[in-house]
């Protein structure tokens, strides 16, 4: 049974912790066999992937990867049977608004949207200082620490996940998520980010927000969710945090069960395609060998 706080909408009206070869027909049979063997090794790599989906996680403003990992302890227990989570720490130190200094080494930010180098989710029309560096940082993690299937973000991290999904839709990033979880997310008000929301995003997403959130009001999270066609909504009665109680447990389990099933089905199809490719390569090798013998 789905959680009583979980309400599903389909918006059809608007679409571990870290700091971060071609063969010639005249080729001999042995050489062709060697080439086929090399291709086989390359094509068999997906079978080595674990039977869990892997999720890259992005923390909120003034947090870091360890902080988010600790806060998601219960959530990770709920979903750990189906998913593995890797937590990144943003490359930028937070500038403390009280002093204008960057002495809060453990407090990190993905970008700043105010002229004083700080960030506020409700700010509109501001800059996006440091965003490109963070984008490159996450793209490198996605490539070097992958493969990953999904993204998860909280607060500013969820805003970032929304931007990454939009950029992926427009093929403006090397990141290609199959799904995403966005908790206390919102649309970025930075002018440089407006184009990321031009297309409706179709991957499955879970949007989580608190009805009493006074940092990112629920309306801001709802506005973000409207840009996703296959959005599942999980409301909770609390404030600005990632909920993980018995009331949300089944929603998380159901979501990750579905994503794991989709991942395994796609993996099976890919492996079947690889077998067909290898069978075709073997037949071509036999034909090339026969043609070579005839010419002798």
Model-identified regions with their sequence ranges:
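Active-site nucleophile loop of the alpha/beta-hydrolase fold
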Residues: 90-91, 180-189, 238
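Post-His helix in hydrolase/transferase enzymes
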Residues: 244-258
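Catalytic histidine neighborhood in serine/cysteine hydrolases
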Residues: 226-243
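Serine-hydrolase catalytic machinery in alpha/beta-hydrolase-like enzymes
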Residues: 49-148
């Amino acid at each position: 049974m789905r959680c009583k706080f979980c309400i599903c909408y389909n918006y059809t009206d608007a679409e571990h912790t870290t700091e971060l070869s071609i063969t010639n027909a005249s080729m001999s049979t042995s050489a062709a066999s060697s080439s086929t063997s090399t291709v086989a090794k390359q094509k068999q790599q997906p079978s080595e992937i674990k039977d869990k989906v892997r999720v890259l996680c992005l923390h909120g403003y003034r947090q870091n990867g360890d902080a988010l990992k600790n806060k998601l302890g219960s959530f990770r227990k709920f979903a750990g049977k189906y998913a593995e989570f890797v937590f990144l720490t943003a490359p930028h130190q937070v500038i403390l608004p009280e002093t204008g200094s960057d002495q809060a080494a453990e407090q990190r930010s993905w970008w700043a949207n105010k002229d004083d180098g700080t960030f506020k989710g409700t700010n509109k029309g501001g800059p996006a200082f440091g965003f490109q560096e963070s984008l490159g940082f996450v793209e490198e993690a996605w490539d070097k620490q992958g493969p990953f299937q999904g993204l998860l973000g909280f607060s500013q991290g969820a805003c970032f996940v929304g931007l990454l999904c939009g950029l992926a839709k427009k093929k403006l990033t090397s990141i290609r998520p199959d799904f995403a979880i966005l908790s206390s997310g919102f649309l970025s008000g930075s002018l440089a980010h407006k184009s990321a929301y031009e297309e409706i995003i179709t991957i499955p997403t879970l949007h989580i927000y608190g009805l009493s959130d006074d940092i990112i009001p629920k309306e801001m999270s709802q506005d973000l969710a409207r840009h996703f066609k296959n959005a599942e909504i999980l409301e909770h009665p609390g404030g600005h945090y990632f909920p993980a109680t018995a009331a949300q447990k089944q929603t998380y389990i159901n979501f990750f069960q579905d994503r794991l099933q989709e991942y395994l089905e796609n993996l099976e199809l890919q492996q079947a395609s690889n077998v067909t490719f290898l069978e075709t390569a073997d037949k071509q090798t036999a034909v090339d060998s026969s043609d070579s013998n005839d010419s002798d």
